[in-house]
Regions:
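N-terminal hydrophobic or amphipathic segments with adjacent small-residue motifs
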Residues: 35-36, 56
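Short, charged/polar low-complexity linear motifs in solvent-exposed/disordered segments
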Residues: 33-35, 84-85
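Arg/Lys-rich, positively charged N-terminal/basic patches that mediate binding to nucleic acids
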Residues: 1-32
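Basic/aromatic recognition patch in beta-strand/loop cores that engages polyanionic ligands
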Residues: 43-86
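A short, aromatic/hydrophobic, helix- or strand-capping loop or linear motif
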Residues: 28, 32, 39-47
Length: 86
């Protein structure tokens, strides 16, 4: 069984969320469970051309949450959250 990861969220990611409401609650709940489901990956991946690091992107309540797994230290780093526009 995969080991759970500790989740770290860049504070700037929280600033784009609504101050209250269901959408905010859904994203915060995703942060809470991400450590135990990170091994499943996101909805899609992006590769940073400079670092060659793979980032996972998950759609949650109208937001794109970008994160990566730092395997050696069992941590997940949430590095970006932005609203999805059509």
């Amino acid at each position: 069984m995969p080991r759970d990861y500790r989740v770290f969220v860049n504070l700037e990611c929280l600033e784009v969320l609504p101050k209250s409401g269901r959408r905010r609650e859904a994203v915060i709940e995703f942060f809470r469970i991400l450590g135990s489901i990170a091994h499943l990956g996101g909805d899609f991946q992006m590769i940073d051309p400079e670092s060659s690091r793979r980032f996972e992107v998950t759609h949650v309540a109208g937001f794109a949450v970008t994160w990566w797994i730092d395997g050696p230290v069992y941590e997940v780093k949430v590095v970006d959250v932005h609203a999805i526009t059509n």
